[in-house]
Amino acid sequence: MAKAKFERNKPHCNIGTIGHVDHGKTSLTAAITKILAETGGATFTAYDQIDKAPEEKARGITISTAHVEYETKNRHYAHVDCPGHADYVKNMITGAAQMDGAILVVSAADGPMPQTREHILLARQVGVPALVVFLNKCDMVDDPELLELVELEVRELLSKYEFPGDKIPIIKGSALAALEDSDKKLGHDAILELMRNVDEYIPQPERPIDQPFLMPVEDVFSISGRGTVVTGRVERGIVKVGEEIEIVGLRATQKTTVTGVEMFRKLLDQGQAGDNIGALLRGTKREDVERGQVLAKPGSVKPHTKFKAEAYILTKEEGGRHTPFFTNYRPQFYFRTTDVTGVVHLPEGTEMVMPGDNIAMEVHLIVPIAMEEKLRFAIREGGRTVGAGVVASIIE
């Protein structure tokens, strides 16, 4: 069968399946492609194709992730599914596969399990905006009261981690029934019901171009007679010639005006998200700007030194540390384009962190960095990556 070409005129959304091992995440992913393929919105991808996910590298960390894509009436989706629990942890922390929302899969036969809890917590920490729940394997539970009990448990767990537990849609069904065409109501119909809820409940993400301008500084040049040019890739938003911007991070915030934008040696009137540009700054000296700072829309981003983070620490096999670390560990934190030294404070009751652990910790940087929640970073020792993290909340 010829692959149907995806129309790119629908809004795009990135989602993924999360939940405990063997609760049916991969089966559900396969079932979604099967049911949506009936209306031409997907190409059916079988369980074993998804299960042997290829390895990818993100921030120096190897992660196995399977990607499928499909579309509903309203949206085009890119969907990620990971084979192992460790892959989920790494994926969510590194942001290798950005999630605008997630489908939490819970087996009705088992109810919430340790990884269910951990994935909900991770989703909260890394800032996944919305979850929809698929209560799977409902064909294995005969007692409707038991189903209600499991649903209640899931809602309580979601509320505990500050998701709106009483509002989140929970769809009861069976991925296997959908794959085997055995029970239309729990299979086919439940999958369509799930996708209707994903369409409606997961908010449409704001496109990078619509967000406030930000560009990490990669290099700085002085051009005689013209001034200082700063180069980098625009992360989000648009910058127009003549606009005022701020230079944020590493030192006191400065205001300046962009007097020129060039790309591939051509002068433009603006630069936008995704463009590699050179920005000419009025009255800014070569020594006033350095790599590691950002150019940003005034007031849109502030420099900070103290934050709470969720981090994954590489194993020895992944090229990480061979030994644990303790409170007051001082590695470098690599944000966007530069390393900054910081001091780690472990939570009360956590004696040490072993390679392979993921951990919530507090970090105090020795100089401020332009930062906001959800910003990703690498943890490095002498240029070698030993971990990855995400800003969960800012302290000061």
UniProtKB/Swiss-Prot annotation:
Residues given in the record as GTP binding sites: 19-26, 81-85, 136-139
Region (G3) location: 81-84
Region (G1) residue spans: 19-26
Keyword Disulfide bond: no
Positions of region (G4): 136-139
Reactions mediated catalytically: GTP + H2O = GDP + phosphate + H(+)
MF-aspect GO terms: GTP binding; GTPase activity; guanosine tetraphosphate binding; translation elongation factor activity
Binding site for Mg(2+): T26
Broad enzyme group: hydrolase
Keyword set includes Hydrolase: yes
Subunit architecture: Monomer.
Known function: GTP hydrolase that promotes the GTP-dependent binding of aminoacyl-tRNA to the A-site of ribosomes during protein biosynthesis.
HAMAP family given in the database record: EF_Tu_B
Protein name: Elongation factor Tu
Lineage summary: Bacteria, Pseudomonadati, Pseudomonadota, Alphaproteobacteria, Hyphomicrobiales
